[in-house]
């Protein structure tokens, strides 16, 4: 009922297409004795983080990537965590790996991320790889921004010349997404906004594409959207009843031309491009 008019940007169907391609590429790598391996480092027993990690390894099984898990207690020291990362850096079976965030408060997240071998940075969030993105040099790309761009292209949403309003300034989505969209291969014009931006509805009504990644429940409403615009819902938070919701209000479906559901939109592609980063590195190593 709420989705009258808008075309669904279906992340699950798009992910499945990517997985078919990845499975063929992993089969070829395995035949050459170069099976990719994805490592995960999980600290503590947060149910959400555990579920995310389980999902990533289930994805690995679907395409033939080896799983390497390092599950650590919540009270682990910074030194022991860094030793675990050093071990994965040196492990030839580990093509790439991620540190599941957030870490417990007594641990230094930035120090952990910087300890990852940039070549094994499956999330594309190492400072060196983010710097390469700024310089437009080849490197692993952040998974969620890459997934957003792929999803828009898959449904033929015009990016070149488009005015894109990104709401959210986090390092995992907002900041790197602006860098991706302004490359010559995308050629979008990006306005980066956040929860303290003045006159936000006025800005979003001028957008061809809105990316909502602020983590504020239902902050983007129909009144903020130009008819026919594409709206991508990335934010995840809980409403007053404790239910997981996105940043986009359901009434947006009645106005927009394209909308990504949440869940089922960008999330599946974040995981798909995590595996893609690992497979691409395995192919590069095999080629060298």
Swiss-Prot record:
Superkingdom classification of source: Bacteria
HAMAP family assigned to the protein according to its UniProt record, in alphabetical order: THF_DHG_CYH
UniProt lineage: Bacteria, Bacillati, Actinomycetota, Actinomycetes, Mycobacteriales
BP GO annotations: L-histidine biosynthetic process; methionine biosynthetic process; purine nucleotide biosynthetic process; tetrahydrofolate interconversion
Keywords from the named record: Amino-acid biosynthesis, Histidine biosynthesis, Hydrolase, Methionine biosynthesis, Multifunctional enzyme, NADP, One-carbon metabolism, Oxidoreductase, Purine biosynthesis
Signal peptide start and end residues: none
Xref: Pfam families: THF_DHG_CYH (PF00763), THF_DHG_CYH_C (PF02882)
Pathway: One-carbon metabolism; tetrahydrofolate interconversion
Annotated Gene3D superfamilies: Leucine Dehydrogenase, chain A, domain 1 (3.40.50.10860), NAD(P)-binding Rossmann-like Domain (3.40.50.720)
Catalytic reaction(s) noted: (6R)-5,10-methylene-5,6,7,8-tetrahydrofolate + NADP(+) = (6R)-5,10-methenyltetrahydrofolate + NADPH; (6R)-5,10-methenyltetrahydrofolate + H2O = (6R)-10-formyltetrahydrofolate + H(+)
NCBIfam families in alphabetical order: PRK14193.1 (NF010789)
UniProt name for this protein: Bifunctional protein FolD
Protein source organism: Mycolicibacterium vanbaalenii (strain DSM 7251 / JCM 13017 / BCRC 16820 / KCTC 9966 / NRRL B-24157 / PYR-1) (Mycobacterium vanbaalenii)
Assembly and binders: Homodimer.
GO molecular function, one term: methenyltetrahydrofolate cyclohydrolase activity
Positions with a binding annotation for NADP(+): 168-170, 195, 236
Disulfide bonds: none
Family of the protein in this entry: Belongs to the tetrahydrofolate dehydrogenase/cyclohydrolase family.
Function: Catalyzes the oxidation of 5,10-methylenetetrahydrofolate to 5,10-methenyltetrahydrofolate and then the hydrolysis of 5,10-methenyltetrahydrofolate to 10-formyltetrahydrofolate.
Gene Ontology CC terms, in alphabetical order: cytosol
EC number annotated for this UniProt entry: 1.5.1.5, 3.5.4.9
């Amino acid at each position: 009922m709420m989705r009258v008019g808008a075309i669904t940007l279906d992340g699950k169907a798009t992910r499945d297409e990517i997985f078919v391609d990845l499975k063929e590429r992993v089969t070829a790598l395995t035949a050459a004795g170069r099976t990719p391996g994805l490592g995960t480092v999980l600290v503590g027993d947060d149910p959400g983080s555990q579920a995310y990690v389980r999902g990533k390894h289930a994805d690995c099984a679907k395409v033939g990537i080896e799983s390497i898990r390092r599950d650590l207690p919540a009270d682990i020291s910074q030194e022991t965590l860094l030793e675990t990362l050093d071990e994965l850096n040196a492990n030839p079976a580990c093509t790439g790996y991620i540190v599941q965030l957030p870490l417990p408060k007594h641990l230094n997240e930035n120090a952990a991320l910087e300890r990852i071998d940039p070549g094994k940075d499956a999330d594309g969030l190492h400072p060196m790889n983010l710097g390469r993105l700024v310089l437009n040099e080849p490197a692993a790309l952040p998974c969620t921004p890459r997934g957003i761009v792929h999803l828009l292209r898959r449904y033929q949403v015009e990016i070149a010349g488009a005015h894109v309003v990104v709401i959210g300034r986090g390092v995992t989505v907002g900041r790197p997404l602006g860098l991706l969209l302004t490359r010559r291969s995308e050629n979008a014009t990006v306005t980066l906004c956040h929860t303290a931006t003045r006159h936000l509805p006025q800005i979003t009504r001028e957008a061809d594409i809105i990316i909502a990644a602020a983590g504020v429940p239902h902050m983007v409403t129909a009144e903020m959207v130009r008819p026919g615009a594409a709206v991508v819902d990335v934010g995840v938070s809980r409403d007053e009843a404790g239910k997981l919701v996105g940043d986009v209000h359901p009434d947006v479906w009645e106005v927009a031309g394209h909308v990504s559901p949440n869940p089922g939109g960008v999330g599946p592609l974040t995981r798909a491009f995590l595996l893609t980063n690992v497979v691409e590195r395995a192919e590069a190593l095999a080629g060298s």
